[in-house]
């Protein structure tokens, strides 16, 4: 039989051991006696092949056997205050923004799936992504002091040094509250956005008050110059509008002037014309101020 042959091979292996083996003679005798015992034990056993008639297969007509068909499922009563969990196919009551905020508080900003210059971009949602820009620094909040900003000019300038040329951007910005206060600023930076921001700060440091009448025009004529630029300003009747061009028009509109005439002479330089406009405005005076200096009432000012 197969079992007897396997045991006989085992006994033969145990008997033909090498002389260099570390096994003692007593252990060898015990192995031989054990193998002979197995031969006598299993030599009397005979293997019988099972036939197909010896097996029986039972098929249930009903999917539920009789044992469990009559059993009624009776779950225990839920305790007081128990809230059943939602089903897997039911949506959450939280909004996407609440889920995103909770995720950000626990795990920090999520990976947007985009990379720039070999660096992963971590952003929470589309709103934050638009405000910060992909791969860029987050935008700074604008200064809310009632002043509006208008860019007059942005130019690229270079500075020649020993090592080569240094490229920068120069921006001219006019700020005003359209209530008689206006300022002109100029600054340079390596980026356009930084140059505009620095120019706006410089313009806020040089605020000038523009005297106006109740018709939103100048009280009288005035002229101003800055370098080679010369600007003439004239009052206008209601409904005329601002008739001027270039930097002069921007300065007058940001100051809140609605009816005025302006003319720039001598130079087309935007910065010099803007500063010449401020110089002309600073020479204007209100009628009541002149009457107060002279010590007379305003009715006698034109006598």
Curated annotation (Swiss-Prot):
<dbReference type="InterPro" id="IPR018192">
    <property type="entry name" value="Ribosomal_uS5_N_CS"/>
</dbReference>
<keyword id="KW-0809">Transit peptide</keyword>
<dbReference type="Pfam" id="PF00333">
    <property type="entry name" value="Ribosomal_S5"/>
</dbReference>
<dbReference type="GO" id="GO:0009534">
    <property type="term" value="C:chloroplast thylakoid"/>
</dbReference>
<dbReference type="InterPro" id="IPR000851">
    <property type="entry name" value="Ribosomal_uS5"/>
</dbReference>
<dbReference type="GO" id="GO:1901259">
    <property type="term" value="P:chloroplast rRNA processing"/>
</dbReference>
<dbReference type="InterPro" id="IPR014721">
    <property type="entry name" value="Ribsml_uS5_D2-typ_fold_subgr"/>
</dbReference>
<dbReference type="GO" id="GO:0003729">
    <property type="term" value="F:mRNA binding"/>
</dbReference>
<dbReference type="GO" id="GO:0009955">
    <property type="term" value="P:adaxial/abaxial pattern specification"/>
</dbReference>
<keyword id="KW-0934">Plastid</keyword>
<dbReference type="Pfam" id="PF03719">
    <property type="entry name" value="Ribosomal_S5_C"/>
</dbReference>
<keyword id="KW-0689">Ribosomal protein</keyword>
<dbReference type="GO" id="GO:0015935">
    <property type="term" value="C:small ribosomal subunit"/>
</dbReference>
<comment type="subunit">
    <text>Part of the 30S ribosomal subunit.</text>
</comment>
<dbReference type="GO" id="GO:0009535">
    <property type="term" value="C:chloroplast thylakoid membrane"/>
</dbReference>
<protein>
    <recommendedName>
        <fullName>Small ribosomal subunit protein uS5c</fullName>
    </recommendedName>
</protein>
<keyword id="KW-0699">rRNA-binding</keyword>
<keyword id="KW-0694">RNA-binding</keyword>
<comment type="similarity">
    <text>Belongs to the universal ribosomal protein uS5 family.</text>
</comment>
<dbReference type="GO" id="GO:0009507">
    <property type="term" value="C:chloroplast"/>
</dbReference>
<keyword id="KW-0687">Ribonucleoprotein</keyword>
<dbReference type="GO" id="GO:0019843">
    <property type="term" value="F:rRNA binding"/>
</dbReference>
<keyword id="KW-0150">Chloroplast</keyword>
<dbReference type="InterPro" id="IPR005712">
    <property type="entry name" value="Ribosomal_uS5_bac-type"/>
</dbReference>
<dbReference type="GO" id="GO:0009579">
    <property type="term" value="C:thylakoid"/>
</dbReference>
<dbReference type="GO" id="GO:0009409">
    <property type="term" value="P:response to cold"/>
</dbReference>
<dbReference type="GO" id="GO:0009570">
    <property type="term" value="C:chloroplast stroma"/>
</dbReference>
<dbReference type="InterPro" id="IPR005324">
    <property type="entry name" value="Ribosomal_uS5_C"/>
</dbReference>
<dbReference type="InterPro" id="IPR020568">
    <property type="entry name" value="Ribosomal_Su5_D2-typ_SF"/>
</dbReference>
<dbReference type="GO" id="GO:0032544">
    <property type="term" value="P:plastid translation"/>
</dbReference>
<dbReference type="InterPro" id="IPR013810">
    <property type="entry name" value="Ribosomal_uS5_N"/>
</dbReference>
<dbReference type="GO" id="GO:0005783">
    <property type="term" value="C:endoplasmic reticulum"/>
</dbReference>
<comment type="function">
    <text>Binds directly to 16S ribosomal RNA.</text>
</comment>
<dbReference type="GO" id="GO:0003735">
    <property type="term" value="F:structural constituent of ribosome"/>
</dbReference>
<dbReference type="GO" id="GO:0005634">
    <property type="term" value="C:nucleus"/>
</dbReference>
<feature type="domain" description="S5 DRBM">
    <location>
        <begin position="147"/>
        <end position="210"/>
    </location>
</feature>
């Amino acid at each position: 039989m197969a079992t007897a042959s396997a045991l006989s091979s085992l006994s033969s292996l145990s008997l033909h051991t090498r002389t260099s083996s570390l096994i003692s003679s007593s252990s060898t005798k015990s192995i031989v006696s054990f193998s002979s015992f197995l031969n006598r034990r299993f030599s009397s056993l005979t293997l019988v092949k099972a036939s197909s008639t010896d097996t029986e297969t039972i098929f249930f007509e009903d999917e539920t056997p009789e044992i469990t068909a009559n059993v009624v499922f009776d779950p225990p009563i839920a305790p007081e205050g128990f809230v059943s969990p939602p089903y897997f196919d039911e949506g959450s009551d939280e909004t996407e923004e609440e889920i995103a905020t909770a995720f950000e508080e626990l795990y920090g900003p999520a990976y947007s799936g985009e990379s720039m210059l070999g660096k992963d971009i971590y952003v929470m949602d589309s709103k934050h992504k638009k405000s910060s820009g992909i791969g860029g620094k987050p935008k700074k909040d604008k200064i809310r002091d009632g002043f509006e900003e208008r860019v007059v000019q942005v130019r690229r300038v270079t500075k020649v040094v020993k090592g080569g040329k240094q490229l920068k951007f120069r921006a001219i910005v006019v700020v005003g509250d359209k209530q008689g206060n206006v300022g002109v600023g100029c600054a340079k930076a390596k980026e356009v956005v930084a140059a505009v921001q620095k120019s706006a700060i410089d313009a806020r440091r040089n605020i000038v008050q523009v005297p106006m009448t109740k018709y939103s025009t100048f009280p009288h004529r005035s002229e101003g110059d800055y370098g080679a630029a010369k600007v003439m300003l004239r009052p206008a009747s209601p409904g005329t509008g601002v008739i001027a061009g270039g930097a002069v028009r921007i300065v007058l509109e940001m100051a809140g002037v609605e009816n005025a005439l302006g003319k720039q002479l001598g130079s087309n330089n935007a910065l010099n014309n803007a500063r010449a406009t401020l110089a002309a405005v600073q020479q204007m005076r209100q009628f009541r101020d002149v009457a107060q200096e002279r010590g007379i009432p305003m009715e006698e000012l034109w006598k």
